[in-house]
Amino acid sequence: MPMLNIGPDARSGGMANVGVGLSPDANAIFWNPAKLAFVGKGTTYGGLSYTPWLRRLVPDVELMFANVAAGVGERGGIGASLRYFSLGEITFRNEQGEEQGTYRPYEMSLDVAYALQLSDHFSGGVSLRYALSDLAQGQVVGGQLTKVGQTVATDVSMFYQGDEFSMQDGQRGQWVGGLTLSNIGAKIRYSESGAADFIPTNLRGGAGFNWTLDKYNRVSILTDVNKLLVPTQPTRDLLDADNDGDRTEIIAGKDDNVGVIAGIIQSWDPSAKPDGFKELMREFMVNVGTEYWYNEQFAVRAGYQHEDVTKGNRRFFTMGFGIRYNLIGLDFAYLFPADQTVRSPLENTIRFSALVDLNQIMK
């Protein structure tokens, strides 16, 4: 379920999906649930996000995200979100090429989260997730009747927000950082006898610096590093080079048909990867982003994501902007590829988000 790792909101989207150390808002439940502890006592935010996905390839794939975050007591915070990923209209055919009907496969997840300040600067958070994937809509594939895939998972995270300190000319600075271990959960299965697939367990760590120039101008510079915690697929002797009749023989790496915890451990083992330590290093994805605020009302954002060419080659720049006025906030993000010689299905991706201060509405 790659959908579980797609950044849903336009604020982080405008910063190349940097989010683990970004200042807390309603979208914290996705990037770092621990940030919910710092949304503020008596504060309640609601958010909606919409992303047309892979528009260069298909016209009707889209990701929708609804969320809410609230401060609880002096040091707590809670959040909830619903994510819905529509794969558009697909015509199914049998092995003879005959149409079996037109359907709209989809995936969704429902999250709840709680966070607590452990000190004035540190917080911890945990979220629980129910995820559903209905890809084949009960069709017979490879002689097997498919079913809806379901799983449950959890995220565990921490967040650090330092004291502001004085700099020259009246400027102020603040260090921030965080760590999120997400999608720790059972494998997902689409048929009774078929193989179970890993969900995208992910480790995301990040740090940043908030620089307040004066009462009107503030700049944040942040970076995230991501690594999938699932075992790397081994290289198999598919061509039967040794003529022993076994085309499933592993000739480099280790068997990836292991349990969830064993898979997390194996994801760090260089000997389990066909290209050893070099491949382990290639599995880290780096995101860098910056955000400028004027008078806490208008924001401009930019970012860059780098992924190794052998691990997806998702390299792109992003830009975005945001507006806050009274109880409403609006954000927009746009993605364009870093390599203009290689066309990417993600190019020209846009994201829209709206944020509402629910406390102000209820007054």
What is the predicted role of each segment?
Residues 1-363:
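Subset of outer-membrane beta-barrel
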